[in-house]
């Protein structure tokens, strides 16, 4: 009897869990900001961390995917129009921008030793070699990496995978996404640099050409 009660309780939990899981929605267009302090090369200053999702639109102007990003800006910059903007990607091509973010250029990095192994206490620490002192940085997660996903249309149909997966498709939708990001954050006057690791190198070469030729950036 006890086993039967346990089994019934477990089945009820699974039904509730499954029901809740099916009702979850992917955030399409969100924004959260926090303020922090750091020290880079002996200079202490504050910066703003912005995380969010930003859509990729189809030809009808409806969102067909949403990309998660993390955007860091240094506060109290006098000449913000001329401050460089770094757009950063990892490779794979199925990798989120996590390693460029928390192991290379971001203001916070994993607590690791000089060989790259984690050390106690596990966690994060300020990155004394971050480039946030001289440039603002946005770390972008392409579709199906990190929290970035394709999203269904009004008829609950998913977009064609060919719109996102492939060398040219990858470059095309990311070019449009970057254009939207730059416009939303008023960074058209800023010098822009795109960096990538591994396959990210191939990606950013294509992006640089496409942004110049199709977006006049």
How would you describe each model-predicted region?
Residues 147, 196-209:
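Glycine-rich nucleophile elbow surrounding the catalytic serine of serine-hydrolase chemistry
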Residues 186-199:
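Alpha/beta-hydrolase fold nucleophile elbow
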Residues 61-163:
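N-terminal cap/lid subdomain of alpha/beta-hydrolase-fold enzymes
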Residues 75, 180, 210-214:
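Active-site catalytic microenvironments for nucleophilic, acid-base chemistry
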Residues 1-23:
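Bacterial Sec-dependent N-terminal signal peptides
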Residues 106-112, 202, 208-217:
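A catalytic-pocket lid/entrance helix-loop region that shapes and gates access to the active site
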Residues 60-66, 162-175, 199-205:
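Phosphate/oxyanion-binding active-site loops and adjacent basic polyanion-contact surfaces
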Residues 21-85, 103:
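Catalytic-loop region of hydrolases
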